[in-house]
Amino acid sequence: MSARGTVFSGSSDAYDRFMGRYSTPLAEQFADFVGVAAPQRALDVGAGTGALTAELVRRLGADNVAAAEPSTDYAATLRERFPGLDVREVPGEELPWEDASFDAALAQLVVVFLNDAPGAVRELARVTRPGGVVATCMWEVDGVEMMKALNEIRQRLSPGGPTPATDYRDEASLRKLFEEAGLREVETSRIEVSVEYETVDELWEPAIRVGGPGGPAVRSFTPEQLAQGRAIFEEALGNPRGGYSLKGRAAAVRGVSG
């Protein structure tokens, strides 16, 4: 069973320390790839705790940005973090905005978790004006070293549990997704980020507090399993001593609406 339709759980703070350290630098490069610039109006679908939203607000201003996020907790975080921002607590397949409401509609690190990815892409295209840009990006399979280490725990301690979804995690499948949705001038790219850490605990502690895909449900582990999991995790990272860096690599796609 894959992690289709996943809604992340855990505190927003833990998520930011877990995946936000990757999604924040990714957002800047993704927005560059899309060509986000004033005076555009943009939508962030599956906004999470706001990594991409923050980059869009920085470039366009809060009045020109809207966000869709199905998690009640994360939607509340978005409203607190960006006062006055148009935040709707909805999934990507059910966007409430009218046709042609935006110049650009983006979905960062979400398409693989949707129940209906093709339907969501069509929704992004619908709310984007003709000639506007629709784009998404997703971590490649084994593209995030930290997630590979978590998957090692799953394989060794919980082999019968859910496995991470693998579709829409490469340029070819993303291109096909967009072309079949009727988008034009489809282009793909790969984006790589690097994150610095000082200790293994700096990464492990938020990892065990955040639910969602990419690894085992470590929050339900017994103390003995947690100890085993941490040892496996450290081994998978190469038993680092002192500071170390981990890479993340994403596939990205953009297309023109209408």
Model-flagged regions — what are they?
Residues F8-S9, Y15, W97, F102, ...:
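Conserved hydrophobic/aromatic "anchor" residues
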Residues M1-Q40, A51-E55, R59, T72-T77, V133-G160, ...:
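Conserved class I S-adenosyl-L-methionine
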Residues S2-F8, Y22, T49-A51, T166-G258:
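Conserved Class I S-adenosyl-L-methionine
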Residues R41-L95, A104, G119:
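Class I SAM-dependent methyltransferase SAM/SAH-binding core
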Residues M19, S23-A27, T49, S71-Y74, ...:
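Conserved donor sugar-nucleotide recognition element shared by glycan-biosynthetic enzymes
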Residues D103-A117, E140:
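A short SAM/SAH-binding and catalytic strip from SAM-dependent methyltransferases
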Residues P118-V133:
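A short glycine-rich, Lys/Arg-flanked "PGG" loop and its adjoining helix->strand segment in the class I
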